[in-house]
Regions:
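Hydrophobic membrane-insertion alpha-helices, especially the h-region
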Residues: 1-16
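Hydrophobic alpha-helical transmembrane segments in integral membrane proteins
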Residues: 18-22
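Functionally critical loop-and-helix segments that line ligand-binding/catalytic clefts
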Residues: 23, 28-33, 41, 172-230
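Substrate-binding cleft of extracellular glycoside hydrolase catalytic domains
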Residues: 26-30, 36-42, 58-142, 148-150
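Hydrophobic faces of well-ordered beta-strands that scaffold small-molecule active sites
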Residues: 32-36, 53-57, 82-88, 116-118, ...
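Catalytic domains of cell-wall/extracellular-matrix polysaccharide-remodeling enzymes
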Residues: 117-188
Length: 230
C-alpha cells in the first residue's frame, strides 16, 4: 500500500514538473495557434482568440475531399480577433491541376490572411525509395507556385523533418516551412512554425476539442511580417 502511494506520488510529481517545464518553454514563444478540422467539433472562436493569435482550418485534401466543417468554421472565425489560414493536404496520387481546381472550387476567395498551408506526408508507396518522387516534387512545386500566383498569398509547407529534408527542400529550398511533430526548441529559417502537439485537446465549455497546437518560431515583429504575406 505504501509502495503504491509512493509510486502514484512520484507519478503526479513527475507530471507536474513536466507541465511546469513545458509552460516555461512555451512562454518563450509570443505567438500561439491551433489547427482544426471537422473532428474538432464546434469551437467558440471568440474564446479561442483569448489565448491564441491564429487558427488554420482544414479545407481540402487531394482532388475530391473537402472538410465538412470548413465553410462553417471559416465563417464563424471571421467574427473573432484571430488571424485565419486555410489548409490543403497534398496528394501524390492525383494531378496538380485537379488538386488546384478542387481547392479553388471549395474555398473560393475564403483563403484567410495567412499563408496557405500545404500539408505533405508520406503514405503507401510514396516515400524516399520511390523512383517517381522527383516528378512528385515538381507537382508540389507547381501547386505551390499556382497558389501563390492565384491568391497573391504566401504558402507554408507543413511536413515532418524527414519529408522536409528528403522531398520538399530539394524542389522548394526557400519555401516557408511548418515543422510537423516537432519539439519546442531552436529551428533555423525557413522553419516558421513548430507543431509541438498534433493530438492536443482544448477544453471549451466543458467539452474536449481535438486540435493541433503550434507556435510561431519568431518574434512579434517577425510574426507581423509573416502574417501579412498577401
Amino acid at each position: 500500500m505504501v509502495l503504491t502511494l509512493v509510486v502514484v506520488g512520484l507519478g503526479i510529481w513527475g507530471w507536474r514538473t513536466w507541465q511546469s517545464y513545458q509552460q516555461a518553454r512555451l512562454a518563450r514563444y509570443p505567438i500561439h495557434g491551433v489547427t482544426i478540422n471537422q473532428d474538432s467539433g464546434y469551437l467558440d472562436f471568440q474564446q479561442l482568440a483569448k489565448n491564441n493569435q491564429f487558427v488554420y482550418i482544414q479545407a481540402t485534401s487531394g482532388a475530391t475531399y473537402s472538410d465538412n466543417d470548413f465553410s462553417n468554421n471559416y465563417s464563424r472565425a471571421q467574427g473573432a480577433e484571430i488571424k485565419v489560414g486555410v489548409v490543403h493536404t497534398f496528394s501524390f496520387s492525383t494531378s496538380a491541376s485537379r488538386q488546384l481546381h478542387h481547392f479553388n472550387q471549395t474555398v473560393g476567395r475564403q483563403t484567410g490572411t495567412l499563408p496557405i498551408m500545404v500539408a505533405v506526408s508520406y503514405y503507401d508507396q510514396y516515400n524516399s525509395s520511390n523512383q517517381d518522387m522527383a516528378a512528385q516534387g515538381q507537382k508540389l512545386k507547381k501547386i505551390v507556385t499556382a497558389l501563390e500566383t492565384t491568391y497573391q498569398q504566401g504558402v507554408v509547407i507543413y511536413a515532418n523533418k524527414t519529408v522536409l529534408t528528403q522531398f520538399v527542400r530539394p524542389v522548394l529550398p526557400n519555401q516557408d516551412e511548418w515543422m510537423a511533430d516537432g519539439h519546442l526548441g531552436h529551428y533555423d529559417s525557413p522553419v516558421q512554425l513548430i507543431e509541438y502537439n498534433a493530438s492536443g485537446k482544448l477544453s471549451q465549455n466543458g467539452q474536449s476539442q481535438a486540435v493541433g497546437f503550434t507556435v510561431f518560431n519568431g518574434t512579434q515583429r517577425q510574426w507581423t511580417k509573416f502574417s501579412q504575406q498577401n
